[in-house]
Amino acid sequence: MSAVPDIPGGPAQRLAQACDALRLPADAGQQQKLLRYIEQMQRWNRTYNLTAIRDPGQMLVQHLFDSLSVVAPLERGLPGVVLAIMRAHWDVTCVDAVEKKTAFVRQMAGALGLPNLQAAHTRIEQLEPAQCDVVISRAFASLQDFAKLAGRHVREGGTLVAMKGKVPDDEIQALQQHGHWTVERIEPLVVPALDAQRCLIWMRRSQGNI
């Protein structure tokens, strides 16, 4: 795999260039909210240890650019705060068993003026079944476990989407053998300034499974 060049400049310049590289239109208000989100993540991280990533530049790449890379593919069809900022007409619910993470999401919903964003402090398997168009995971579980735990929250005709690193061939084989869900497509992602493999795994119920 060839190296991905870094993006020079300050956070605002790097964000603008990353959006251009992703062909993702982001107005001034959206960009301001995205930068405030990263600033608040840095502040909360000093006290609550939300993420092991400490370097502000790497936080920009691995938490912001990485999440932005899924916005356009999902619209053709991370996550969380970033999706709510970039797509105000989507209703986004973040589910996490770690209370400090859901508290942070709620704080961001208020601080950034995101009425379309909410957080549920629970485990996905403990939620009452929802009727979601899309359920997306990032660094969560194997494809089979993800489908087993989250599949009941997807409406008929809806989609499960897993954000992965390199294509997980063993997980795909295990999922297909189980028979309830099938991989519809695998979409490679290019994250600006990140020299690592990323892909989206799109899954739908197998015919006859509702």
Curated annotation (Swiss-Prot):
Keyword ATP-binding: no
Transmembrane segments: none
Keyword tags: Cytoplasm, Methyltransferase, rRNA processing, S-adenosyl-L-methionine, Transferase
Keyword Zinc belongs to the record: no
A single GO molecular function term of this UniProt record: rRNA (guanine-N7-)-methyltransferase activity
GO CC field: cytosol
Superkingdom assignment: Bacteria
Catalytic activity: guanosine(527) in 16S rRNA + S-adenosyl-L-methionine = N(7)-methylguanosine(527) in 16S rRNA + S-adenosyl-L-homocysteine
Main localization (coarse): cytoplasm
Pfam families attached to this UniProt entry: GidB (PF02527)
Sequence positions that bind S-adenosyl-L-methionine: 78, 124-125, 138
UniProt-annotated location(s): Cytoplasm
UniProt xrefs under SUPFAM superfamilies: S-adenosyl-L-methionine-dependent methyltransferases (SSF53335)
PANTHER family, per database record: S-ADENOSYL-L-METHIONINE-DEPENDENT METHYLTRANSFERASES SUPERFAMILY PROTEIN (PTHR31760:SF0)
Record-linked HAMAP family: 16SrRNA_methyltr_G
Family, similarity comment: Belongs to the methyltransferase superfamily. RNA methyltransferase RsmG family.
Name this protein carries in UniProt: Ribosomal RNA small subunit methyltransferase G
Gene of this entry: rsmG
